[in-house]
From Swiss-Prot:
Gene3D superfamilies: 3.30.70.860, YajQ-like, domain 2 (3.30.70.990). The keyword Mitochondrion does not apply. This is Nucleotide-binding protein Clos_1967. Belongs to the YajQ family. Keywords: Nucleotide-binding. It comes from Alkaliphilus oremlandii (strain OhILAs). GO terms for cellular component: cytosol.
Length: 163
């Protein structure tokens, strides 16, 4: 009797790489002519990045710098959820960016229905913040991975524990 093969679908971010990207962004902000001395900050608290800038234009510039540094570090921009730009006293602008960790129930259901509707001979089951896909044939598992990579899902997916 053949043993089932499986893999897990997860959505995780390496927070150390996020910290490195934030440090690189802060260094570039302190050295750039248009941002030097503007008291612009980029900070991470747990799963949120907060950006403080003197005005909207500088805030957008800082977001562009941060996005560039994150992509250079291998962090997908799909893992970022941008909050509204808030205006404080003195015309300062602040934006909070949430880092998406894990797959929520709604997205997990979409992934499982996408796999089931594809008629690939695999089973998908939701396990907390991940989705386990199992099947008899490794080629079917590879087809499921390819299907999910081609589907433009609004989150960053990694495929782990391929057995």
């Amino acid at each position: 009797m053949a043993k089932d093969n499986s893999f897990d679908i997860v959505s995780q971010i390496d927070l150390q790489e996020v910290d490195n990207a934030i440090n690189q962004s802060s260094k570039e902000i302190s050295q750039r002519f248009d941002l030097k001395g503007t008291n612009t900050t980029v900070e991470r608290n747990d799963t949120e990045i907060s950006i403080n800038a003197p005005d909207d234009m500088k805030l957008k510039n800082v977001v562009d710098i941060l996005q560039t540094k994150l992509t250079q570090r291998g962090i997908s921009l799909k893992a970022l959820e941008y909050g509204k730009i808030e205006h404080a006293l003195g015309g300062r602008a602040k934006q909070v960016i949430k880092l998406q960790q894990g797959i929520d129930k709604d997205q997990a259901k979409k992934i499982t229905t996408l796999i089931k509707d594809s008629k690939i001979k695999v089973q998908a089951s939701i396990q907390g913040e991940s989705v386990r896909v199992s099947g008899k044939n490794r080629d079917d598992l590879q087809a499921a991975i390819q299907l999910l990579k081609e589907a433009d899902l609004p989150m960053n997916l990694q495929f782990t524990n391929y057995r």
